Amino acid sequence: MDTAQVFSEYTKTMLHLMLTLAFLLPSLLAISDDSENGDNTYVASLDEVTSFFKTSHKIWLYATSEGPQRQCLSITKSSEDQSTRTYNFTQQYIDNTGTPTTYLTVNLSQGESEKPPGMTVTMADGKETAYTPEKFDVNEQCGIFSFTRAGKQQCEMYVSHETIRWTTPQSCFKEFDIVCKGMEKHQLYSSSCPW
């Protein structure tokens, strides 16, 4: 192939690439704009939430809008009743008193049409908190949940141990910033967490 033929093939390839980009770029920008502007058309499904909790692996509270008083907080499923969508967990964390262990129960219910499923977390002392499952990423095995505590809206991002063994959940961090816009973000997990 002489120089003129190489240049001609190069020009054709570049023209094809430019035309492809011209058609794809508006679509890509629209998807990006929806995410950055907090597109609210996505509604978490009951199947996504139940799949997230069906794991036998530890689930870490990776980031929260509440303060960083508890570090390395994780939950591990101890039992489940699929007929009632009830999951029992052992919770461990580190705080200024040591490494407490406590227990909690998650109850899921079908949400109304176009609404996320209901989720109630009951602590061992009987205190209940209603959570809203907001977003899930099946690739990063993470979920973002919102709730109200002391009259203030809060957010938490939970990530499967299988994910954070190998990677940092970048997509989930981005979604946390969108779903929990304007809230503080404290990372509670680090690779030095003991369990």
State what each model feature region is.
Residues 2-195:
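A beta-rich soluble binding module of mature secreted/lumenal proteins
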